[in-house]
A protein has these predicted regions:
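Conserved SAM/AdoMet-binding glycine-rich loop
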Residues: 1-17, 33
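Structured loop/turn residues at beta-strand edges in well-structured enzyme cores
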Residues: 2-3, 69, 178
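Short coil/turn linker and secondary-structure boundary residues
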Residues: 14, 26, 106, 196, ...
Length: 225
C-alpha cells in the first residue's frame, strides 16, 4: 500500500512568524521529526504550500529544504477564492472575504522561472494523465532528483465531472474552482475529495466497519467514471 498513498502535511512557511503574522502551519521541529520518521519507513510525503503575498518570501527556501534536506514532494497552491475565510486573525465573510483574497492572492506565474531553474525537467499536463477523464485543474509538475513539485494554478481553469455540473450547488453558484480529481483522507478520518467543499460527498469513517469504509470509497470513485 505504501506505493499507492501520499501522506500530506500543510506547511506554509519555514518560520512561525512572517512579517509579524503568525503561521500555525509552519515547518516546526515536530513536523520535521515526523517527516523523517515516515520517510525512514518508506512512506511518500508531500508538503502542501498555499502561496500568498505574506509567505511568498519563504516559498523558494521552503521548497528546496523540503526536497533536498527532507526528501519530500511539494505541491504549490494559489489561494482559492472563498466566500468565507478564517484569515490570519479573525473570521471574515462576504465582501471582506473577497477583499482579503484580493490582498493576499499572488499568481503562480511568479514561480515558474524559479521552478524551471531548479528542476531537471517538467510536464505541463502531469495530473491529467493520472486522473480519469482529466478532471480538475490541469497541474504542471517539475522534477528535481527523485522528487517533484506540483503546481496548482487556478488561472488554468478546471474540468468538472458530470456530477458537479448536474448536482452540485457550489458549482452552479461559481463557488468551486477545482472540481473532482482525487480522494483525500484527512487526519480526522473524514474521506472526501481534495479541494471539494460539498459536505454530501464527505464520509466520516470513525468507528465504521470494513464494509462501510469500502462502500464510501466506492461511492466517491463512481464520480471518476
Amino acid at each position: 500500500y505504501k506505493a499507492r498513498i501520499d501522506i500530506v502535511f500543510s506547511v506554509d512557511s519555514i518560520s512561525e512568524y512572517v512579517e509579524g503574522v503568525h503561521f500555525p502551519k509552519y515547518l516546526s521541529k515536530e513536523v520535521i521529526r515526523i517527516t523523517k520518521l515516515l520517510r525512514s519507513n518508506g512512506l511518500s510525503i508531500r508538503y502542501n504550500i498555499v502561496v500568498t503575498r505574506l509567505n511568498q518570501s519563504e516559498v523558494r527556501s521552503l521548497v528546496l529544504k523540503a526536497i533536498d534536506e527532507l526528501d519530500v514532494n511539494v505541491k504549490l497552491l494559489d489561494l482559492n477564492k472563498f466566500s468565507e475565510y478564517f484569515g490570519y486573525s479573525n473570521k471574515v465573510s462576504g465582501e471582506a472575504a473577497y477583499k482579503l483574497w484580493e490582498e493576499l492572492f499572488i499568481s503562480m506565474s511568479n514561480f515558474y522561472d524559479f521552478l524551471s531553474e531548479i528542476s531537471n525537467y517538467s510536464e505541463s499536463e502531469w495530473t491529467t494523465q493520472l486522473i480519469s477523464k482529466g478532471n480538475g485543474i490541469p497541474m504542471s509538475c517539475y522534477f528535481r532528483g527523485n522528487n517533484w513539485i506540483q503546481v496548482k494554478d487556478s488561472t488554468r481553469g478546471a474540468k468538472y465531472s458530470e456530477y458537479c455540473i448536474s448536482n452540485c450547488l457550489l458549482y452552479k453558484t461559481g463557488n468551486c474552482q477545482e472540481g473532482v480529481f482525487s480522494l483525500f483522507l484527512s487526519s480526522n478520518m473524514v474521506l472526501h475529495l481534495s479541494g471539494c467543499k460539498n459536505t454530501s460527498l464527505q464520509y466520516n469513517l470513525n468507528g465504521e466497519e470494513g464494509w462501510q469504509i469500502k462502500r464510501a470509497f466506492e461511492n466517491l470513485m463512481e464520480l471518476f467514471k
